[in-house]
Amino acid sequence: MIPVTSFAGKTVAVFGLGGSGLASCHALKAGGAEVIAADDNAENVAKAAQAGFITADLRDVSWAGFAALVLAPGVPLTHPVPHWSVLKAREAGVEVIGDIELFCRERRRHAPDAPFVAITGTNGKSTTTALIAHLTKVAGYDTQMGGNIGTAILSLEPPRTGRVHVIEMSSYQIDLTPSLDPSVGILLNVSEDHIDRHGTIAHYAAVKERLVAGVQAGGTSIVGVDDGYCRDIADRLDRAGKNVVRISVKNPLASGIHVEHGTIVRTAGGARSEVAKLGGIGSLRGLHNAQNAACAAAAALAMGISQDVLQDGLRSFPGLAHRMEQVGRRGNVLFVNDSKGTNADATAHALSSFADIFWIAGGKPKAGGITSLTGFFPRIRKAYLIGEAAQEFSGTLGTQVAHEISQTLDVAVEHAARDAEASGLTDAVVLLSPACASFDQYRNFEIRGTKFRELVQALPGVKPVV
């Protein structure tokens, strides 16, 4: 745990008592603050009370004595409308911050030179975060990984020399971190997402920009420049005098890091050097993972990690569950769990990575459906449609792609495995990449992906991928 000493002797309200909120309560209390815990969920309030915290309905207390409101990232700060606790705080002139802001203040107080790598982007954040954490561990760092990837930042060990914090940040978390100042900041990409919480794509992109704009003096801002928003951001950072490393997997760069034919290449001052090779690394398959790997490589190089260690780390990276996860093989058939593919953009990355696909798709549909994926239809040998989206997706596939409405995941896995094996194709792939949320049949994408893995591994003759 990281004791938060910056509010010692003061009273702090914490709203939102899930994982990060409860960790904030413990960290503030350990640092000497008085904590008033609150949540709209009575169950969460009861848990906080059982943990020994003072709880209250913040609508019924005076805000005059609060030094800050620590807000959970899932609570609306601005859009669609600010949460009532935010309005109360603003009326009382109380600053509204998040748990990562508390971390930043503690780092500046106690270990300002401790490495702090922050990662954001619309897609690829978790894989890049996990990959950088893996690389730093291979390089011998005491590595602490957390943030949006799942572990509350304040439950990690405190910053210190030789210890690196590798932190995934959502746009919500950036919004709540006004003094964000990583030593290495990474912006992978920006595409339309979470507009319900940010109002416009311009505001969403501006929030993302703050992570790389806030990099501390002497640090490195790493920006993927394969979309227009990020190209503009990189140019603005240049003009502001930041040390910018541009990343591309689509075009060679005169200065920066790009990927060509499976090789990560660095160019600077007219010189070109090969940094690492991605060929044969199953956990980093696909153009999207090439971008993740290139950004991670740039971070590793910025931290002084050698190319030999970098290459070893890339090759030994196991990948993340539910993200292009190779869960088994039977004869000519590879089974891939990409349950994290909850929208068409994410699924496009998976479909672009294989040639002969038996595709399991569907769930709770999102706006636009799969119409943007028509360019990948020639790669799909047959589709197996599940959940609420089945009829809609069937209409989009029409006569272009052979398909069936399997309705449930167990039926889809059974039929896709049978058809893929019977196809005689050398590299057939049964791919779960639903292009949908899971909520019609599963509580979250993790449970859906775990069910897929279990179904595959229960098939006779399926072996682990080595």
Curated annotation (Swiss-Prot):
One of its GO terms (molecular function) is ATP binding. It is an enzyme of class 6 (ligase). It is found in: Cytoplasm. Pathway: Cell wall biogenesis; peptidoglycan biosynthesis. It comes from the Bacteria. One of its GO terms (biological process) is regulation of cell shape. Its EC number is 6.3.2.9. GO terms for cellular component: cytoplasm. ATP binds at residues 121-127. Keywords: ATP-binding, Cell cycle, Cell division, Cell shape, Cell wall biogenesis/degradation, Cytoplasm, Ligase, Nucleotide-binding, Peptidoglycan synthesis. Signal peptide: none annotated. It catalyses: UDP-N-acetyl-alpha-D-muramoyl-L-alanine + D-glutamate + ATP = UDP-N-acetyl-alpha-D-muramoyl-L-alanyl-D-glutamate + ADP + phosphate + H(+). The keyword Plastid does not apply. Cell wall formation. Catalyzes the addition of glutamate to the nucleotide precursor UDP-N-acetylmuramoyl-L-alanine (UMA). NCBIfam families: murD (TIGR01087). Belongs to the MurCDEF family. PANTHER family: UDP-N-ACETYLMURAMOYLALANINE--D-GLUTAMATE LIGASE. This is UDP-N-acetylmuramoylalanine--D-glutamate ligase. The lineage of its organism: Bacteria, Pseudomonadati, Pseudomonadota, Alphaproteobacteria, Hyphomicrobiales. The gene is murD.
